[in-house]
Amino acid sequence: MEYDGRVILYIIKADETSYINYIKPLILAEEIQFPHVLSVIDTRDEWFYSIHPERMVPSLKDQDPVTGEKVIVFESTACLQYLVDRFDTDGTWSGRTVAEKGAVLSWTAYQTAALGPTAKYWLYFKRGYPTRANPVQLPRTIEKQWDILEKRLKEPGQQYIALKDRPTLADLSYFPFAMPWMFTFLGVDIKDWPHIQRWSERMLSRPAVARVLQRAPTLGH
């Protein structure tokens, strides 16, 4: 797909779990309405090495509006950060003050280092190796991460993860791995983390989130 002035968001055909991580930039696209187009690709294609060193999604292609230079961004957190730097001019999603930016950056980075990779490995084992013995350490590790998130959301007035008053990149980063679907898929009761449950309900009530979750399982079909 050639660049035509819209950000190209690279995704793969949706199956039961493949869309879970790439809904992050799709939700952001719905929230801030930047011009974009989805490109459903086959990650086995050699050309995709020019986009991602391991041919993974989400990734994106854009163009510098000043120099015209090609822009390639890969990994979900990097995609989110790039897109808010480019299109979220008032800092709604990335933070408006130094303190807000620090909180958003910290919680987003922490998800990237902790809950994100742990949840993805658990999905990998559950989806790809259903007959393999249960990887005991993974459930324990992910439940610890949910405990940390529960403690954060339990703080007075903490409606969202990084900031109290509104969702940010941190919430988009956590959402796929802390939404009700994920708990159900992994065979865990979200009611054991009541503040996460209420937070996820707030996220699910957002029209942009609802639209993406309705559409995502059909992408590429």
Swiss-Prot record:
PROSITE patterns from the UniProt entry: GST_CTER, GST_NTER
Domain of life: Eukaryota
Pfam families listed in its UniProt record: GST_C (PF00043)
GST N-terminal domain: residues covered: 1-91
Catalysed reaction, written as an equation: RX + glutathione = an S-substituted glutathione + a halide anion + H(+)
UniProt KW keywords: Transferase
Span of the signal peptide: none
Gene Ontology MF terms in the entry: glutathione transferase activity
Listed EC numbers: 2.5.1.18
Pathways per UniProt: Mycotoxin biosynthesis
InterPro entries (alphabetical): Glutathione-S-Trfase_C-like (IPR010987), Glutathione-S-Trfase_C_sf (IPR036282), Glutathione_S-Trfase (IPR040079), Glutathione_S-Trfase_N (IPR004045), GST_C (IPR004046), Thioredoxin-like_sf (IPR036249)
Domain spans labelled GST C-terminal: 97-221
UniProt keyword Ubl conjugation present: no
Similarity comment: family membership: Belongs to the GST superfamily.
Reported function: Glutathione S-transferase; part of the gene cluster that mediates the biosynthesis of aspirochlorine (or antibiotic A30641), an unusual halogenated spiro compound with distinctive antifungal properties due to selective inhibition of protein biosynthesis, and which is also active against bacteria, viruses, and murine tumor cells. The non-ribosomal peptide synthetase (NRPS) aclP is responsible the formation of the diketopiperazine (DKP) core from the condensation of 2 phenylalanine residues.
Protein name: Glutathione S-transferase aclG
Biological source species: Aspergillus oryzae (strain ATCC 42149 / RIB 40) (Yellow koji mold)
Gene assigned in the entry: aclG
